[in-house]
């Protein structure tokens, strides 16, 4: 799986040598620059300070940890931006609580659906990087990350063992004998 994913990533990076319109890093660099300019001109209240990217792989690799932080954890700091900021912070807290509970009720590694897990995690990682690299505004970032949330929760649900979860009585498919 990792070999296939790496192969496609390399093809995407070197697609610009085949056709000049396919320079992925340059396109992402332009998107980030345009987004910062638009947010600054509009006076966005949730603009986060980000380091400006350059259209080379080293710049993107250096900013990858910050991009992941921006996508996954910066909505926690958005509570000061009004009711929508509070809702995005509560959403993040709910995800963290759910993930910690799913880890508590995990199943053995041999029983985990690994292809589904790898797909979900790679999709979330790639989308989170693109969002984090290009989006310095928390409000837009919260909207752009919506497609990755179901896959993130599905990835963590691959670890959950339904037999270990203490379901309430009304939610059980096979009620316990009385």
Feature-to-residue mapping (PLM):
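Alpha-helical transmembrane segments of multi-pass integral membrane proteins
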Residues: 66, 88-97, 101, 126
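Transmembrane-helix signature of polytopic, lipid-linked glycan biosynthesis machinery
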Residues: 125-140
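Membrane-interface helix-loop-helix junctions at transmembrane boundaries of multi-pass membrane enzymes
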Residues: 85-86, 100-122
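Alpha-helical transmembrane segments and terminal signal-anchor/GPI-anchor hydrophobic tails
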Residues: 1-91
């Amino acid at each position: 799986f990792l070999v296939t994913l790496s192969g496609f990533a390399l093809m995407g990076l070197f697609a610009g040598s085949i056709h000049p319109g396919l320079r992925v890093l340059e396109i992402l660099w332009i998107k980030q620059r345009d987004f910062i300019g638009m947010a600054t001109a509009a006076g966005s209240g949730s603009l986060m300070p980000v380091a400006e990217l350059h259209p080379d792989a080293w710049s993107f690799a250096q900013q990858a940890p910050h991009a992941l932080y921006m996508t996954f954890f910066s909505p926690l700091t958005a509570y000061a931006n009004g009711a929508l900021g509070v809702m995005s912070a509560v959403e993040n807290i709910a995800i963290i609580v759910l993930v910690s509970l799913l880890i508590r009720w995990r199943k053995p590694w041999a029983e985990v659906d690994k292809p589904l897990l790898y797909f979900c995690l790679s999709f979330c990682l790639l989308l989170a990087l693109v969002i984090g690299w290009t989006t310095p505004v928390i409000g837009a970032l919260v909207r752009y990350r919506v497609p990755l949330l179901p896959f993130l929760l599905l990835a963590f649900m691959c670890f959950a063992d339904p037999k270990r979860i203490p379901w309430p009585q009304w939610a059980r498919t096979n009620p316990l004998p009385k």
